[in-house]
Amino acid sequence: MSKNRRLFTSESVTEGHPDKICDQISDSILDEILKKDPNARVACETSVTTGLVLVSGEITTSTYVDIPKTVRQTIKEIGYTRAKYGFDAETCAVLTSIDEQSADIAMGVDQALEAREGTMSDEEIEAIGAGDQGLMFGYACNETKELMPLPISLAHKLARRLSEVRKEDILPYLRPDGKTQVTVEYDENNKPVRIDAIVISTQHHPEITLEQIQRNIKEHVINPVVPEELIDEETKYFINPTGRFVIGGPQGDAGLTGRKIIVDTYGGYARHGGGAFSGKDATKVDRSAAYAARYVAKNIVAAELADSCEVQLAYAIGVAQPVSISINTFGSGKASEEKLIEVVRNNFDLRPAGIIKMLDLRRPIYKQTAAYGHFGRHDVDLPWERTDKAEQLRKEALGE
């Protein structure tokens, strides 16, 4: 590798990874509540370990959801259906500890500061202030057709394929837990030129040999997913590099909601504000504003106003308007960043109520995001992945 080239690595995990089990359970509960009560306030956390699921958090709703039933159904869909896996949908214990949302927080969210002080009408802001303070990032770049960085894009596709070959009985000896990792080499112009390394670790039946796993994973998982032109004789493969991965899932490691925030976003290629997504309704700006920031960044790149774009939004609890908007195009912008911020303010309502309305976030759409990434998805219709504002942004930014 020449001195002007660099390597960058991102990872993903399968739906059977312990932390991802928790994300999916939390978002399944959120979706079940939103089906019946779109205005519910939900902050749902899940923890799993051998034979045990604990669901806790703060939920304010007018409806009833059978949480243990939802938990078991989600675990069953993932594929933990036999006790010998160390975790089984039918026999695991499910404990719940749910409180209502704090009245102090609800006061700020129910009626935003601007409305309480009379500077904006309730109708205008739909009486929703930010559910917490914090900062959120969104990112897009033109490395892939989904406008995502190549390393995380490939890592997600490999993880999804790993689950597909298990569920479709192409490789029936695989079990639900698994991880993928892709290292991409970039040239001096910051363009991806080749794959330097691929790492795949997959849980498996104890009687399958390492040689068979390595051969099958390369044939049925890597080759159908990774573009042939990015592979060369120096590409390195690490398939189950420890030699054995039989004990996995919650039996191998305890899991928690919100512990895969880099997998959920951009694989470390862009910055992260620290807030997790799963189990949170859209009044939580950790989730909704991160989606809005991606929506903004993706439309800027789709409009060819920049090759890459990172958007930061920041909020104060109980205040509807973002306290700051920042845009970084890393020197690739066709318009100044000040101009881009002006155009963004004109075309995107970044108040929590505005985001919810703009992206229609009171729907049960969240479980499908809880594995294989919240961004760059073409297998599901996610409103923040649309590029419907690109043409208008370009027109305003460049005066076309």
Curated annotation (Swiss-Prot):
Gene Ontology molecular function terms on file: ATP binding; magnesium ion binding; methionine adenosyltransferase activity
Domain of life: Bacteria
Enzyme Commission code(s) on record: 2.5.1.6
Keyword annotations of the record: ATP-binding, Cytoplasm, Magnesium, Metal-binding, Nucleotide-binding, One-carbon metabolism, Potassium, Transferase
Annotated GO CC locations: cytosol
Residue positions binding Mg(2+): D19
Positions bound to ATP: H17, D177, G178, K179, R244, F245, D253, R259, K260, A276, K280
Binding residues annotated for L-methionine, in chain numbering: E58, Q101, D253, K284
UniProt xrefs under InterPro entries: ADOMET_SYNTHASE_CS (IPR022631), S-AdoMet_synt_C (IPR022630), S-AdoMet_synt_central (IPR022629), S-AdoMet_synt_N (IPR022628), S-AdoMet_synthetase (IPR002133), S-AdoMet_synthetase_sfam (IPR022636)
Region feature Flexible loop, mapped onto this chain: 101-111
Catalytic reactions of this protein: L-methionine + ATP + H2O = S-adenosyl-L-methionine + phosphate + diphosphate
A Pfam family annotated for this UniProt entry: S-AdoMet_synt_M
Cofactor(s) of this protein: Mg(2+); K(+)
Metabolic or biological pathway, per its Swiss-Prot or TrEMBL entry: Amino-acid biosynthesis; S-adenosyl-L-methionine biosynthesis; S-adenosyl-L-methionine from L-methionine: step 1/1
Ranges annotated as spanning the membrane: none
Binding site for K(+): E45
UniProt enzyme class: transferase
Record GO biological process: one-carbon metabolic process; S-adenosylmethionine biosynthetic process
Alphabetical list of NCBIfam families matching this protein: metK
Function: Catalyzes the formation of S-adenosylmethionine (AdoMet) from methionine and ATP. The overall synthetic reaction is composed of two sequential steps, AdoMet formation and the subsequent tripolyphosphate hydrolysis which occurs prior to release of AdoMet from the enzyme.
Subunit structure: Homotetramer; dimer of dimers.
PANTHER family: S-ADENOSYLMETHIONINE SYNTHETASE
Name assigned to this protein: S-adenosylmethionine synthase
Organism of origin: Bacillus subtilis (strain 168)
